[in-house]
């Protein structure tokens, strides 16, 4: 029986899969574990009553497991690992924090209006550290196999690449060869393409935050 999962609909296009990296993380987990699922698209700008009844906080993703609705991508991924242990996506503890500061650094730089506030350099250092990690331990975060760390990181890298190029005319430095190889491998993969929002929806999704900062 397919699991039901509520995910973000594209801004301005309620019938199209949206751009939430946390939703994509869960969808990628389901894809990697080959767990059948059906998606319910939620317009976060006009949340339907049925959605607020199952999750009063109004956040996505939310997934129905054993007749219970579960929120929060960290919690969901943990439950999926317990319920569907094969293939294992457990990240070895020594690699669990790889890239954990990347997304906050990206958001600070993206929304910054001061070119001298250090946010660009902070993001550069995070990307550099990830590139060096992949050089030493790749091709994936934990070596030769895909783990939960990859499935959390890759959707965020997708947003970083699209949003910064559009809003800041900023690209991930070409010198980060291992990082570029990593994203190229993932972004062209069938499961990633199936579960990612379109480029224009990523841009629309960030526009409000950028313009209001």
Each model region followed by its residue ranges:
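C-terminal helix/juxtamembrane-tail motif
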Residues: 200-213
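GST superfamily/GST-like fold recognition
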Residues: 144-166, 178, 186
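Acidic carboxylate-rich catalytic motifs and surrounding loops in phosphoryl-/glycosyl-chemistry enzymes
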Residues: 40-46, 194-202
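GST-like domain detector, emphasizing the conserved glutathione-binding G-site
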Residues: 1-141, 145
